[in-house]
Amino acid sequence: MVMGYRVGIDIGGTFTDLVYFDEYSKEFHVVKVPTTPKSPDVGAINAIETAKIEFDKINILIHATTLGTNMFLGQEHLNPPKIALITTKGFKDVIEIGRQRRPKLYDLFFEKPKPLIKRRDRYEVEERIDANGNIITPLNEEELQKIAEIIKKKDYEVVVISFLHSYKNPIHEKKAREIIKNLCSNVDVITSYEINPEYKEYERTSTTVINAYLKPLVSNYLKNFIDSLKNKGFNGKFYVMQSSGGISNIKYATERPAAFIESGPAAGAIAVAYFSKILNDNKVIGFDMGGTTAKASTIINNSPLVTNEYEVGGEVHAGRLIKGSGYPVRFPFIDLAEVSAGGGTIAWVDEGNALRVGPISAGADPGPVCYGKGNDKPTITDANLILGRLGEKLSGGLLKLRKDLAEKAISKLAEKIGESVEEIAYGIIRLANTTMAKALRIVTVERGYDPRDFVMYVFGGAGPLHGVELAEEMEISSILIPPSCGVFSALGLLLADCRVDKAKSILKDIDEVDEEEIENIFIELIEEGLKEVEGFEEIKIVKQIDVRYKGQSYELTIPWTGDLKELADNFHKKHETVYKFSSLEEDIELVNARVTIIGLLTKPEIKCYEVKEYKPKPESYRKVYFSSGWEETAIYNRDKLKPGAIFEGPAVVEEYDSTIVIPPDYTAFVDKYGCLRIER
């Protein structure tokens, strides 16, 4: 391959971040531009042009986007497709009934999420396969042909086929797809056995419907983006980041868009995992605060924790999606907790005259009040500006902040409550920190971990403004700010590997199977997965099994080492870690076999420098507000801090893509990789 550029582009709710690696100079470069919500690809092209990269010299471009998330946030300019669902007779209401959990037990006015497919667009056909894969009732092809005629007349764009127990025997779904395609050649037909071949009909149907819901939008978006790139001379490889933390080719991305809903946050977790390995930090919390939301993840032994079920379109409450308030998706997702607290999150006063922060965001347009684009509702960014934590210029001086406008907006809140402007601004920061701390507790305490045992890696455009105070609230003693922290998720795109996940239901007691039967299932899954991971010199295969005590509803995923006794022992240990108890006498059930096939990519090298300890000279000083009040604070330029620099707080470190706040009584040190480690 001719030397050129490797480019990572992360489109967030407020900014589009670009990191590129120059294969000639072996240097990383970064660019940050406003997101263009109605046409996200325009912002991405703007970022490349701002970076002055020649399109024909881009060898690899890896992309993460919020497009899937935005679809479930009801953005008006995103038009969902017209979808029909065909299912087993008697089961067309499965996606409406869902699971009988009440996410808010005492809320008499709670409304379940509306089904993505209306009842009039759901059709039933006579067929039945039992839980063992045996045909009880043959597929009624004549009935299906009548449904196909209706589909043709009503101009559906996508048809979802989800039959009972098709994960065990997909013969009826295959035949139904064939009949529909023969009679409706212009309709895209998606079957549940291809998207999610696992038991639980509601989750399988929901996953397939969400995939269908996203597919036309994502396919058109990616096609337009790639066409725009090619028109400008791009001829390199194009990959998309999945929610699992692995990248995939364009074909996989367009066929399974539901696997890409949390692609941006996943890239951030991958960057944290990479740095935790080179820095020998085995327990790490990743904290990412951008313009719209804040996310937390847990990295243990250099690998992010992954969950096999996620909810989209649900309510965000205390850092988590309330189970039952959204739509379940069964794809691997990096286990994240997310809250509505970003730089653009709006502060307001409620009917009881109490200060509130979020969940509404000013977004990329108009943005915070201090951007001067017409917004008059104060945000977290405005509060940081008033408190002196932010300077009056961002992005290397490209974005000038209007402190006078921020003060005017926050003074309105101050008048209502009867406090000073700085007290209200500091109250906004404290409320935001309280909300974000809940997310940190979810990925640690609620997963069975003590946060005091962890190092916290802080990144995102707004994360380092809040990271140290958040760590203090969680009693975390060591904080690390990586280089290019404001575009760290985009950097993570360049540090990821290609990944394909395959699964198959087992649903047998552990004493009903032997190692040979399990290995045969894995052989089948590996053969299937390898077809989708081609062209890689080095491939890694990970085998896992979902395990539970018999009678439980949810499983724990345990590595498969080839020995059933070892599997059982490891399950008991993990159950003890997660739930604080285990039961050695209980029967164990094997639910799903899972294979992850990883095509290893060559990573750009993170440069290491000689460390010579010295005390740097501040660029200037300014007053900054902390818990103790206004403090004369040293201001440093991060680009001028060399490895070995050591200095004490209070301090503010400014760089192109972010600003780092170091309160009094903390010491900061620049390590050999350019990371800023802050300790008390």
From Swiss-Prot:
**InterPro entries, per the entry:** ACX-like_C (IPR049517), ATPase_NBD (IPR043129), Hydant_A_N (IPR008040), Hydantoinase_A (IPR002821), Oxoprolinase-like (IPR045079)
One Gene Ontology molecular-function label:
5-oxoprolinase (ATP-hydrolyzing) activity
Could you say which residues form the signal peptide?
none
- One Pfam match, given by its short name, reads Hydant_A_N
Taken from the UniProt entry, a GO cellular component term is: cytosol
What superkingdom heads the lineage? Archaea
What's any GO biological process attached to this entry? Answer: glutathione metabolic process
Q: Where are the transmembrane segments?
A: none
Task: Give the UniProt family note.
Answer: Belongs to the HyuA family.
Its name, as the record gives it, is Uncharacterized protein MJ0964
Q: Which organism is it from?
A: Methanocaldococcus jannaschii (strain ATCC 43067 / DSM 2661 / JAL-1 / JCM 10045 / NBRC 100440)
